Regions:
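Extracytoplasmic ligand/sensor domains, especially the bilobed periplasmic-binding protein
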Residues: 1-96, 143-170
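Hydrophobic alpha-helical
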Residues: 3-11, 119-140, 210
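Sec-exported extracytoplasmic/periplasmic mature domains
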Residues: 10-18, 54-62, 83-91, 111-118, ...
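Second-shell loop/turn segments in exported
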Residues: 36-42, 72, 173-178, 196-201, ...
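Catalytic-loop motifs flanking and including active-site residues across diverse enzymes
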Residues: 48, 78, 129, 184, ...
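Structural motif
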Residues: 48-51, 98-112, 180-181
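Extracellular/periplasmic periplasmic-binding protein-like sensory domains
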Residues: 134-207, 264-266, 270-272
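Segments of small-molecule ligand-sensing domains
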Residues: 194-204, 215-269
Length: 277
């Protein structure tokens, strides 16, 4: 579940005291303050956007960073992460553009950003809209550095962009399924191949890890499973090693992983990189 859906279900989660594991969003309201029933595994949007901001500034010397966002809770959560990361550097968002959810009406948002001539644009939206934004930017002769966060969907964004994707950045909350040598990656790929999937991708890996965490907590809950026992088992994960990815929870910390990885689209693939060039 993403940001708007999570925001809608959290009151019911709290009312019924149902454990909510691994929401597919980095929104801050699921993390702070800590909620007894909620356990986030993927890194927050702040961690992702900070990674992008830090690299734009440290590697490229960029300070004029714009945002293009979906006009809803998801976009607002991503924008808040960028604002916070820039504020830590004494900077502000240089320009902002928006588009309406479930549309491809990106031109007005693009024009709002173009007039300010930013060095880079961090995008928080759906893959079709973000793809349309980048392609329209190129059509208009506008070539800043583009970056998306992981929620965009790497595989779908690359397919949407075609050749226009080369050079764009995507932050990831899971290691690269094709490049990493971690044990979890080897196990994941072997298990996926047993189901006829030869080229698994990031989202599938995230679901795989989420399932591993849940199964471990169920096993640690003992013979007589209750919600409180399950929550206690989740809270008891201290540096728990899942094939090289170490998950941590506590009563006051509902963020299992903080890992963020940087990739760049090159020749139709999202390749891991250490620095922006």
């Amino acid at each position: 579940m993403g940001t708007p859906t999570s925001k809608a279900v959290v009151p019911e989660v709290n009312r019924a005291k149902i454990p909510y594991i691994g929401p597919f969003t980095g929104a801050e309201f699921l993390r702070n303050p800590a909620n007894k029933n909620i356990f986030n595994i993927r890194a927050s949007y702040f961690s992702e956007t900070k990674k992008l901001v830090d690299h734009f500034i440290n590697d490229l010397g960029y300070k004029k960073i714009a945002v293009f966002i979906q006009d809803d809770g998801y976009g607002a959560a991503g924008k808040a992460g960028v604002q916070r990361a820039l504020r830590m550097r004494g900077l502000k968002i240089h320009a902002e553009g928006r588009y309406k959810r479930n549309t491809l009406d990106v031109e007005q948002g693009l024009n709002s950003i173009m007039t300010k001539k930013p060095d880079a644009v961090i995008m928080v939206g759906a893959y079709k809209a973000c793809g349309a934004f980048i392609k329209m930017s190129h059509d208009k002769g506008f070539y800043p550095k583009f970056a998306n966060i992981s929620f965009v969907g790497t595989k779908k964004l690359i397919a949407e962009l075609g050749d226009a994707g080369d050079g764009s950045y995507i932050s990831q909350v899971m290691p690269n399924p094709d490049e990493s040598t971690l044990k979890i990656i080897k196990d994941f790929k072997a298990d996926m191949q047993s189901y006829g999937v030869d080229n698994p991708y990031y989202t599938q890996l995230e679901g795989y890890l989420n399932a591993m965490v849940i199964v471990d907590a169920l096993e640690q809950s003992g013979q007589y499973l209750t919600r409180d026992r399950f929550i206690g088992a989740m809270e008891g994960m201290k540096n728990k090693d899942f094939g090289g990815l170490k998950v941590n929870f506590s009563k006051s910390d509902r963020q299992g992983l903080d890992n963020v990885y940087l990739t760049q689209i090159q020749d139709g693939k999202a390749l891991p990189i250490q620095t922006m060039k």
